[in-house]
Structure formats: structure tokens, C-alpha cells
Amino acid sequence: MDEQKRLLLAVLLSVVVLVGYQFFFTTPPADRNLPQNTQKAPDQARQPATGDNQSTVSDYNRADQGLPAPSPQPSTADFRTISVSTPLYNIAISEYLAAVTSQSLKKYKSSNGSSTDLKQMVDPRLSRGTLITGTQGGTIQGLDNAVFTADTDTTNLTLAQGEKAVAFSWTSPHGITVKKIYRFQADSYLIDCDIVIQNGSGMPLNDALVITTPGIFDEETKKRSRFAFQGPVAYIGNEYLTIKPKDIEDQDTFTGQVDWTGYTDRYFLTAVLPQKSGDAHLKLQYENEIAESRLVWRMDRLDPEKQGEYAFVYYMGPKSHKVLSQYD
């Protein structure tokens, strides 16, 4: 896929600029130990849900889809956590916000001195997790505290080969349905995520999606960041950006062609990659020792009985030339 290839190449080039050497807490596995299927050509990967020249909006009819009328939402205490285990990682997604609350990398160790603890990509102090979806204008009432429902009866899934999809859905009190469809690949750190908005209300919806990747930036992180950058990162307008949290007060918005946004520590990266070009920008926030990188993606106007589909790719893995080059 040319578009995905271009985006991933941008990630790779920016990592090469940032990291001039590869050093991990444990010796990375040799190339021969990496899954061979990761060498597949990009055009063999799953195609985006919509093409660059196609509208993201289509007809949607509640009656045709057999969807029930909106019902009272469950308490935020009534939710499950869906775990998926692949050869590369263990990931946990909560039905609360349909956000990623944990991801441990099986091939990398933690920096806490333990020889057994795996690298954890989501700091446990991030109570809402990461890759959180919201709207800029708050027009989908309740989304910021939503409890989704996953389309699986079991909470523990194993993926040894191929790919597996898990869909999370939620309907607002006004009849707007939000779906987050995660697609995991056994041999890749890439996770496809399609976000579908179905307007079952009686009013048009005109807003922007916001996907947030937060990170802890406390005094200890500040000390480590003196030697290798940690914090919000992005690739915008063919330029690799590293934004120090202390500078966010001076500039919290970056515009231009957004290839990806995310958050990095010294050796690992969490990134959001749109699968097509669109009206987007980066919005940053830093407070209470949490720095947030937010991809703001303008949605097409959704009239009643219309739906919009927006395709993204998430990357949660090593900031390694060796690994990222497999996705060129």
C-alpha cells in the first residue's frame, strides 16, 4: 500500500534522525528470530477502508441494520478488559473508552532492573490508558466517559498467525453510534483501527475526531530526557517534530500535512498514522505531569442516517531501525 508505505517510511526516517545508535536494555533478537511474514510488501497489507479520493460518508439506516433504539448506558464500573496475545506482545483494551490500558512487548525487557519484567508501553499511572478517542467540540454527548461493548464473549484471545478483529461499539443517549474496530496482526506491531460514526440522531453532526496519546512527564522523566528526548513527537509538513513539554505553553498547535503523531520515550514509540490525507492538526497539552499528543481529524458533515468511516494505524513498539524497516 503506497500510502501506508509513505507514512511508515516517515516514521523510520524520523527515528533514524533521533536515534543514531541502537541500544536496548537487553540484546534485541537477531533478524532470523523475527517472524518472516513481517517482510511482506506493503501492498499486501490490508487496504484502507476508504481511498484518498472517496468520501468518508455513506448512507446508514438504523432499521436496515436491525439496531435497537438507544438504551441507558451501563455504569462505568460495568465493563470488561479484552486481552489479545500475539507472538510479539500482550495487549489489553478496556471497554471503558475502548482505550489501550496495557501492552507488554515479549521481546524487550523493562528498564526497572528486573530480568523478567517485559517492557510495558502504557504507564499504569495513565488511568484512562492511551489511544483514547473523543471529539474536539464534544458534540457526541457522553463519549468522554463511554462504556463500549466488545463483540466477543471471551476476554482472553490468542493470535498465533494471521489477523484478528475485535469491534467495540457504543451508542450515545441521542442515538449516535461510535464503533472502534481493532485489527491485530500476529507478525506486526502495527494495529489497524477503523473508527465508524453512525448518526442516528435527528441533528447533523459537524465535529472533529481527537485521538490522544498521553505520557507521564515528571521530574524523573525530565532528567532522563536530557540524554535522549522523551515526549510528544510528530511528522508534519515533511518535518520531524519533538516538542518539549515545557514549550507547549508557548505553542500547543501545529498545522500542515500530518503523517503521524505520537509519544516517545528513549527507545519506544506509540504513534497514530492516518491512512489517508485529510484536514488534521496536532494539539498538545501538559498539566499534572502528563503530556498529551492529540491528533485532531476533521470529520465530514454527518447528516441524520449517515455514517462516516475513518481509518488509522496504531504503532506501539520499539523505536528500532531494524524493526521499523520491515514495514517499508
Where are these regions (language model features)?
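Membrane-protein biogenesis/insertion across secretory and organellar systems
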Residues: 1-328
